[in-house]
């Protein structure tokens, strides 16, 4: 659901990296895609289904036979999975969107459930726009769905319209009025249009819901979804009051949040609860004094409990790979999370440039190296830029394309970044349009790493790229190379899928 907020679709590799992070964090179920929507989404669901072992895989489908069949096919590589089907139940959606009456809606829902049960005995059903559905209709369809074999009933506040006492009222009524309610798990799926997604989710827990749907950092369509890290920590901090617990590995929360922020190109607001950079900052003198005496005076959460560690790095170009590996382990990274040879090579280059390397530098390098595939088709071997005072620039690049090396110079351009991009385009001939360019400082001071995130459009599809270096122009060039490789990979996936369809 979170991907709907992104300007560019994630690649298969990026989705897998997120899935592995979520698995390590300990989420029970992850909804990994909508396989009917595109060949890329089908491939992502299939790939993740093969790799994830400790979390249950779930796939989304409409109440359409082909949707359900494709979802079942995509996940058939794993032993146990869930199909999540949905259909609107509110009067507004039935009248203006579906143009069907409630009896027809029930028939469609039951037929789809039976279809899904051919593939798995774990079916979840969402009554879309449930918070604006009459309670009588909601109770009626929920009872029939449970009788048909649905194990999880999801109550979505699809447009973020509900307030906590209203959603609590809906959940309580289901428990009071649906005779077979004990045979299913009640779930809620809240949106944040009125800023109440987390509050609504907590009120639903108090009313009896035992599954909460959400996204890390609250990423989602419009104003976003329930921020999982906020619900998780609310449950942990107020466990006695709420009477429930989770199986989450809390110490993975911060790193997962940071990783997803980077992959999705969505910076975390500094005042974001739990994971924002100011979440554990104290500027008031009174507060600072109180925290120094006892952190519990002004902190209800121990920063260490979510994975924040005060690791003091003192790494220079004289530090060995054992030291780099030690600090990565101290920050919570496992050996399988990064390639030590690649990371150490990048570390030495950075240390030679800026002297001392900090924890955030190492994390950024590890993230970028993880994004790079060993078999990248495009590789930037060399570039040079010349600029003059009126803002005009020219650039020369040497680009490895597969096994061939091409050299190209750009004509006069408006700035060094545009000059490099024009030179690269003269070699690749990809009809791309730059839509967004963003520079983020990773660290502090004049030697901070600069991360460039770009968004381009290629044949009506959007692609995201990221580059990291102490030099902004180099970061920009690397970001475009990342984009070009993502486009090339997408083209290869489409070719393979066309061949499979012919077979």
Curated annotation (Swiss-Prot):
Subcellular location as annotated: Cytoplasm
Spans annotated as Regulatory domain: 379-503
Record has Transport as a keyword: no
Alphabetical list of Pfam families matching this protein: HCS_D2, HMGL-like, LeuA_dimer
GO MF term set: 2-isopropylmalate synthase activity; metal ion binding
Pathway assignment: Amino-acid biosynthesis; L-leucine biosynthesis; L-leucine from 3-methyl-2-oxobutanoate: step 1/4
Residues the entry annotates as binding Mn(2+): 1, 189, 191, 225
Cofactor: Mn(2+)
Subunit text: Homodimer.
Protein name: 2-isopropylmalate synthase
Species in which this protein is naturally found: Buchnera aphidicola subsp. Uroleucon erigeronensis
Gene name of this polypeptide: leuA
């Amino acid at each position: 659901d979170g991907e709907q907020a992104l300007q560019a679709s994630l690649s298969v590799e990026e989705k897998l990296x997120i899935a592995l992070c979520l698995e390590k964090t300990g989420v029970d179920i992850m909804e990994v895609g909508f396989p009917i929507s595109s060949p890329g989404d089908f491939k992502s669901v299939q790939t993740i289904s093969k790799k994830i072992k400790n979390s249950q895989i779930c796939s989304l489908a409409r109440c359409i036979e082909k949707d359900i069949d494709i979802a079942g096919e995509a996940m058939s590589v794993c032993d146990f999975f869930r199909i999540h089907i949905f259909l609107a139940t509110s009067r507004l959606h039935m009248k203006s969107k579906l143009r069907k009456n409630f009896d027809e809606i029930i028939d469609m829902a039951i037929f789809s459930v039976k279809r899904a049960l051919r593939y798995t005995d774990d079916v979840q059903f969402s009554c879309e726009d449930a918070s604006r559905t009459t309670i009588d209709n909601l109770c009626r369809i929920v009872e029939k769905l449970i009788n048909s074999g649905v194990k999880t009933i999801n109550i979505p506040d699809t447009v973020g319209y509900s307030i906590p006492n209203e959603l609590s009222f809906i959940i309580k009524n289901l428990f009071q009025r649906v005779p077979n309610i004990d045979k299913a798990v009640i779930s809620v799926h809240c949106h944040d249009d009125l800023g109440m997604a987390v509050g609504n989710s907590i009120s639903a827990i108090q009313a009896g819901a035992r599954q909460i749907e959400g996204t890390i950092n609250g990423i989602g369509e419009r104003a976003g979804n329930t921020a999982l890290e906020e619900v998780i920590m609310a449950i942990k901090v107020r466990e006695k009051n709420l009477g429930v617990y989770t199986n989450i590995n809390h110490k993975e929360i911060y790193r997962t949040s940071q990783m997803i922020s980077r992959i999705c190109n969505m910076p975390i607001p500094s005042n974001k609860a739990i994971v924002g950079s100011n979440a554990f900052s104290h500027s008031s003198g009174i507060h600072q004094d109180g925290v120094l005496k006892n952190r519990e005076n002004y902190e209800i959460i121990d920063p260490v409990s979510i994975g924040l560690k005060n690791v003091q790095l003192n790494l220079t170009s004289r530090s060995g790979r054992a030291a780099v590996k030690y600090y990565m382990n101290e920050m919570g990274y496992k050996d399988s999370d990064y390639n030590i040879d690649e990371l150490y090579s990048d570390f030495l280059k950075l240390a030679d440039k800026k002297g001392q390397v900090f924890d955030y530098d190492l994390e950024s390098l590890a993230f970028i190296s993880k994004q790079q595939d060993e078999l990248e088709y495009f590789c930037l071997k060399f570039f040079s830029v010349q600029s003059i005072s009126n803002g005009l620039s020219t650039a020369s690049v040497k680009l490895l394309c597969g096994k061939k090396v091409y050299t190209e110079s750009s004509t006069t351009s408006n700035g060094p970044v545009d000059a490099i991009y024009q030179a690269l385009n003269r070699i690749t001939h990809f009809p791309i349009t730059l839509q967004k360019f963003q520079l983020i400082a990773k660290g502090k001071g004049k030697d901070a790493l600069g991360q460039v995130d770009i968004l381009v459009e290629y044949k009506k599809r959007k692609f995201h790229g990221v580059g990291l270096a102490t030099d902004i122009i180099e970061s920009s060039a690397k970001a475009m190379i990342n984009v070009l490789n993502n486009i090339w990979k997408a083209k290869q996936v489409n070719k393979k899928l066309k061949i499979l369809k012919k077979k």
